[in-house]
Amino acid sequence: MRIELEKATKLDRIRADYNVHYWSQGFYGIDDQGEVYVSPRSDRAHQIPFSAIVNELEAQQLNLPVLVRFPQIVHQRVHGICHAFNQAIEEYQYPNKYLLVYPIKVNQQREVVDEILASQAQLETKQLGLEAGSKPELLAVLALAQQGSSVIVCNGYKDREYVRLALIGEKLGHKVFIVLEKLSELDLVLEEAKSLGVKPRLGLRIRLASQGAGKWQASGGEKSKFGLSASQVLSVIERLKREGSLDAMQLVHFHLGSQMANIRDVRNGVNESARFYCELRALGANIEYFDVGGGLAVDYDGTRSQSSNSMNYGLAEYARNIVNTVGDVCQQYEQPMPVIISESGRSLTAHHAVLISNVIGTETYQPEEVHELGVDAPLLLQNMWRNWENLQDGTDARALIEIYNDTQSDLAEVHSQFATGVLNLEQRAWAEQLSLRIYFELSRKMSTKNRFHRPILDELSERLADKFFVNFSLFQSLPDAWGIDQVFPVLPLSGLGDAEERRAVMLDITCDSDGAIDHYVDGQGIESTLPVPAWSKDKPYLMGFFLVGAYQEILGDMHNLFGDTHSAVVNVDEHGQFEISYINEGDSVEDMMRYVHIDVDAIRDNYKQLVSQRVEANEQAQILAELEQGLAGYTYLEDF
């Protein structure tokens, strides 16, 4: 009984270390066996271990890495956002409705868009629309949107073809809003609407003075890339009045930026934009839709804070602030309350996808005995040994800092003297081993309670951490972790009862020093290393990278010609049985070569020529077969 209690206490501590309960929204967790599970159904009745899913993937001959999608999570996110706004509308007696518009730029994968639309297929009154920000996206949306879909919103810069396609969407039965980003677009819309005989639905993107904080703050404010200034807005209204087309202006739109962490910034932006709405209504524009754009954040680190990786509000608070603010401003200026639209793509899709891969090797530090050099050893090395002896004899907190600083300085001097030929290779190796031994002992003797020790302990943790080489490309699968230091939850998928054994950093398999994850969710903060169970080459070691369903796939690049990973769609039935409903195989080596315009047929001819010239006749068929197999194979490592 005592052992079970200790195990439960340890697992609770580990759950807190990974902060899973808070960033996962209940979709993921750690069970009592230390296994990470997914619970994608709305009733949360069933917990499916990821190890079982991986076993099934392997049974279907799918090698890691694999991106696993859970469409039931997408459905729940749609329902959750719509429910939050519907509740707020009821609470504040707001006399209009809410529409959720999905910007497909967040994740254009067909299975993702289909599931978003399917989430309300059984509802009589649907609250879903789609947004396009380019011609290719618009052409996709025109086909994917349900007939009579609530809305299609067209954002982004537009040429004549883009405008014509949007207007053609009206002929196809869609309700298409063309949002003006710059003044010149108005001429195009009016000309092509007349040419096609279509009455356009226009929107205005307002360039607000309000601005959020964080990585995407440049999306808002007076210097933002998109939107019309107050004077430009008035120019549009005057032009439409002259054309007798003011009734075409039906929507006002703004965008403060993605991942808005502070609800106050959201409220300020909505308030300013609602003032624009009321002023435009007073000028005669029959605007009926109020589009707050994106910004609904994802709590990647689970801290519920104003960090750029978090959010200090929930869905209900977000919806209440928007509905209440719009309602108050409209009431104050005696204007009708519009249909509220949000473009909440990140919040819709982030949670549904998990990248699973395997650790293919590690580099670890194990304390080794270091022997004293002879009396004729260089003075520099003798000083290092003296520090080691002082550390073993026991020292006060201040002396520990001095030993650390001295060791840092001495090791730098060792490297300098080796470069100039004063020290030889054996002496350099001895100094490096001794410094690691000193760092290890310092990490055990220093205390996090001492504020002067904390930054040193962070540095020592990085120095002594295990290096886990994971079979994936950071640039392909987690580009935001590299490009903007986005934090994604990362954790081993099994054996977490022993997760306090080691600390590690995750490195990818690209030939690039940037291919490393630098930040990890750890309790209520971010650390530079991750607590993990010790790695063993005798059994598979699986890592999960969570909340990767927004932006990562489409932003991923092909560094070192690592291509798209395999992906699999997993559903769970009411009995707790899971099924791999769909598999999309990742890129082969040949696929990637063709993408960069390498003539694969010429490659094959070159192989044949080289083999015929250099390889014994009895080996030629086997060598050619292996080369051909390599071209057809997965771009990631397969023999681990």
UniProtKB/Swiss-Prot annotation:
Gene3D superfamilies: 1.10.287.3440, 1.20.58.930, Alanine racemase, Lyase, Ornithine Decarboxylase, Chain A, domain 1. It is an enzyme of class 4 (lyase). Disulfide bonds: none annotated. The keyword Magnesium applies. GO terms for molecular function: arginine decarboxylase activity; metal ion binding. Its EC number is 4.1.1.19. GO terms for biological process: arginine catabolic process; putrescine biosynthetic process from arginine; spermidine biosynthetic process. The modification N6-(pyridoxal phosphate)lysine is found at residue 105. It catalyses: L-arginine + H(+) = agmatine + CO2. Keywords: Decarboxylase, Lyase, Magnesium, Metal-binding, Polyamine biosynthesis, Pyridoxal phosphate, Spermidine biosynthesis. Substrate binds at residues 290-300. The keyword Hydrolase does not apply. Its cofactor is Mg(2+); pyridoxal 5'-phosphate. PANTHER family: ARGININE DECARBOXYLASE (PTHR43295), BIOSYNTHETIC ARGININE DECARBOXYLASE (PTHR43295:SF9). Belongs to the Orn/Lys/Arg decarboxylase class-II family. SpeA subfamily. Catalyzes the biosynthesis of agmatine from arginine. This is Biosynthetic arginine decarboxylase. It comes from Vibrio parahaemolyticus serotype O3:K6 (strain RIMD 2210633). The lineage of its organism: Bacteria, Pseudomonadati, Pseudomonadota, Gammaproteobacteria, Vibrionales.
